[in-house]
UniProtKB/Swiss-Prot annotation:
Residues 65-99, 249-268 are annotated as: Disordered. Belongs to the SGT family. This is Small glutamine-rich tetratricopeptide repeat-containing protein alpha. SUPFAM superfamilies: TPR-like. Ubiquitously expressed. PANTHER family: LD24721P, SMALL GLUTAMINE-RICH TETRATRICOPEPTIDE REPEAT-CONTAINING PROTEIN ALPHA. The modification N6-acetyllysine is found at residue 137. It comes from Rattus norvegicus (Rat). It is found in: Cytoplasm; Nucleus. TPR repeats lie at residues 91-124, 125-158, 159-192.
Length: 314
């Protein structure tokens, strides 16, 4: 049977599917209908010719072809021909150029250069790991995860690949998986402070999911303001004669009731305000240390994992 008819049928089938589920505008739908009619006329096939149907739809065929291109055979496999000296040298040059583009924050260019290096030497874990860092900078965390998987597959002892995998998974809010990869990174590089810090953050995020009513950086402002301990201590602070005297002086136009002779009003007011805040913090710590620890945990949880160490490309 003519494969051209099979291909035409697959395209017509795909276009019909887009008409049903594509969410297209009326103009786009009309254009697809015209395209379908043209294909049916040109190749003499219609959607009713089910004998022309392939085992897979066109999108499935495309997805499989794309996956096979992105995931070539195992670079460590026995059938893989090692790169020539010239290819290895060129791959290193491309990697170095990619590193320079990373420093210039030209992340798309870096992805392209690392990809070229991978084409020449797909058995080098560093190239995949570096491209993962570039993908993360572009917000393509799924791509970063895939490249880290490739790097780990090539070199299971490569700690940086586990660390970058943890960063990408954290960005995807997959904190349980991120914790596992950070632990593996620390197992391979136990003195790495970045891995330790990122592991702590991921563990906190895993234990305490961010509140949907939380404020900036997932700090639960709404919960804080509704906490009776916080309200009681805040009321005590606002009723403090020292704070009331300070605020009265500031409102009256710079009068410095708490200042010392010869000190500037602005400096003394600021110092007094800081002093009042410190007293409030001390009072909170003494009266409800568990609540203070809860606030501290929320602040730590609101931080994002650091990529400072990971930005150093090899």
């Amino acid at each position: 049977m003519d494969n051209r008819k099979r291909l035409a049928y697959a395209i017509i089938q795909f276009l019909h599917g887009q008409l049903r589920h594509g969410g297209l505008s009326s103009d786009a739908q009309e254009s697809l209908e015209v395209a379908i009619q043209c294909l049916e006329t040109a190749f003499g096939v219609t959607l009713e010719d089910s004998d022309l149907a392939l085992p897979q739809t066109l999108p499935e065929i495309f997805e499989a072809a794309t996956a096979s291109k992105e995931m070539p055979q195992d670079p460590r496999g026995p059938d893989r021909t090692p790169p020539s000296e010239e290819d290895s040298a060129e791959a290193e040059r491309l990697k170095t150029e990619g590193n320079e583009q990373m420093k210039l924050e030209n992340f798309e260019a870096a992805v392209h250069l690392y990809g070229k290096a991978i084409e020449l030497n797909p058995a080098n874990a560093v190239y995949f790991c570096n491209r993962a860092a570039a993908y993360s900078k572009l917000g393509n965390y799924v791509g970063a995860v895939q490249d880290c998987e490739r790097a780990i597959g090539i070199d299971p002892g490569y700690s940086k690949a586990y660390g970058r995998m943890g960063l990408a998974l954290s960005s995807l809010n997959k904190h349980a998986e991120a914790v596992a990869y950070y632990k593996k990174a620390l197992e391979l590089d136990p003195d790495n402070d970045t891995y330790k810090s990122n592991l702590k953050i991921a563990e906190l995020k895993l234990r305490e999911a961010p509140s949907p009513t939380g404020g900036v950086g997932s700090l639960d402002i709404a919960g804080l303001l509704n906490n009776p301990h916080f309200i009681t201590m805040a009321s005590s602070l606002m009723n403090s004669p020292q704070l009331q005297q300070l605020m009265s002086g500031m409102i009256s136009g710079g009068h410095n009731p708490l200042g010392t002779p010869g000190s500037s009003p602005q400096h003394s007011d600021l110092a007094s305000l800081i002093q009042a805040g410190q007293q409030f913090a001390q009072q909170m710590q003494q009266q409800n240390p568990e609540f203070v620890e809860q606030i501290r945990s929320q602040v730590v949880r609101s931080r994002t994992p650091s990529a400072s160490h990971e930005e150093q490309q090899e």
